[in-house]
UniProtKB/Swiss-Prot annotation:
InterPro entries: AAA+_ATPase, DNA_recomb/repair_RecA, DNA_recomb/repair_RecA_CS, P-loop_NTPase, RecA-like_C, RecA-like_N, RecA_ATP-bd, RecA_C_sf. It is found in: Cytoplasm. This is Protein RecA. The keyword DNA damage applies. Coiled coil: none annotated. Keywords: ATP-binding, Cytoplasm, DNA damage, DNA recombination, DNA repair, DNA-binding, Nucleotide-binding, SOS response. GO terms for biological process: DNA recombination; DNA repair; SOS response. The gene is recA. It comes from Prochlorococcus marinus (strain MIT 9215). Can catalyze the hydrolysis of ATP in the presence of single-stranded DNA, the ATP-dependent uptake of single-stranded DNA by duplex DNA, and the ATP-dependent hybridization of homologous single-stranded DNAs. It interacts with LexA causing its activation and leading to its autocatalytic cleavage. It comes from the Bacteria. One of its GO terms (cellular component) is cytosol.
């Protein structure tokens, strides 16, 4: 027998043995328990829009379905607003969303103003951390819920701490609770296709001289299990004269398993209204040279449409046909491979005095 014939025979025997063991595994553990990656029906990860076009681009499309997402940042940086927009996007597409309000601080009026259908939003205000995470697990296993938001990890108080007296030390109880919960729910999340967003707060490590002293609550388990981690910060307060009407938020993608990480997105959050979608649109239109900025003036197809950013946004909101056309042109350019840089995006109330550099826009070969 030649060497080539010997290799062919061995290959056939291996294929036969592989088919037998794959069949045995599927009989024991169910269909889909093992598969060839090329045969998987979920090769491309589907996404849920964040409500901010700039953040969607930074994430590679939005929040991934069937994954764990962590959003953390300082107080009043826009964490809850960000998740309420995600809930609104899910509901627009006919999906079901749940909000586990461990902080007992959800404002239904504000949620409704962001486009959330509060009548059909599932809300739970659990008494203990164990109760909250058990509810999350059951919602996931039902395969009937598309998005679950937990606000927040810091408020998931273990039962032992609640039943104890004030001042009792229950060291590591919350970290152990989160570690056990993540082990339990991660597999169910992948099977159901449900996205779970955990909001988290920041704490300062004691005695840190060098490096970043900030850390998130609930131990390290969530950091490992999360496919996406977003660090959201307030970088500017938006004012008209002395009146404050919003904030400029900056989001850094600290971790991303489904797209390139460490991208940065900026957008405006208006008090009582949420994320300024038109502001995001203007940012990207300016970056892709669809709308040109010369000094303080913005022009579209050679005609001035507004002096200053505020006036340009108002003009776009009043001319919906052109606004929709600009949005279509942006999506077309991005599909063709135009890459935008968030570093040149300005705040909502800024009146720039110089034109955008052509070098800020790079075309991917």
């Amino acid at each position: 027998m030649s060497l080539e014939e010997k290799k062919t025979t061995e290959s056939k025997e291996k294929d036969k043995a592989l088919s037998l063991v794959l069949g045995q595994i599927e009989r024991n553990f169910g269909r889909g328990s093992i598969m060839r990656l090329g045969d998987a029906s979920r090769m491309k990860v589907e996404t849920i829009s964040t409500g901010a076009l700039t953040l969607d681009l930074a994430l590679g499309g939005g929040y991934p379905k069937g994954r764990v997402v962590e959003v953390y940042g300082p107080e009043s940086s826009g964490k809850t607003t960000l998740t309420l927009h995600a809930i609104a996007e899910v509901q627009k597409n006919g999906g079901v969303a749940a909000f586990v309000d461990a902080e007992h601080a959800l404002d239904p009026v504000y949620a409704a103003s962001l486009g959330v259908d509060v009548e059909n939003l599932l809300v739970s205000q659990p008494d203990t951390g164990e109760m909250a995470l058990e509810i999350v697990d059951q919602l996931i296993r039902s395969s009937a819920v598309d998005l679950v938001v937990v606000d927040s990890v810091a408020a998931l108080t273990p039962r032992a701490e609640i039943e104890g007296e004030m001042g009792d030390h229950v060291i590591g109880s919350q970290a152990r609770l989160m570690s056990q919960a993540m082990r339990k729910i991660t597999g169910n999340i992948g099977k159901s296709g449900c996205t779970v967003i955990f909001l988290n707060q920041l704490r300062l490590k004691i005695g840190i001289t060098y490096g970043n002293p900030e850390t998130t609550t609930g131990g390290n388990a969530l950091k490992f299990y999360a496919s996406v981690r977003l660090d959201i910060r307030r970088i500017q307060t938006l004012k008209r004269g002395t009146e404050e009407y919003g904030i400029r938020a900056k989001v850094k993608v600290a971790k991303n398993k489904v797209a390139p990480p460490f991208r940065i997105a900026e957008f405006d959050i208006l008090f009582g209204k949420g994320i300024s979608t038109t502001g995001c649109l203007l940012d990207l239109a300016e970056e892709t040279n669809i709308i040109i900025r010369r000094g303080a003036w913005y022009s579209y197809e050679g005609e001035n449409i507004g002096q200053g950013r505020d006036n340009t946004i108002i003009w776009l909101d009043q001319n919906l046909e052109i606004k929709n056309k600009v949005e279509s042109m942006i999506k077309e350019k991005l599909t063709e491979g135009t890459e935008v840089s968030s570093n040149s995006m300005k705040a909502l109330n800024s009146n720039p005095t110089s034109t955008i550099a052509v070098n800020d826009i790079k075309t991917v070969a």
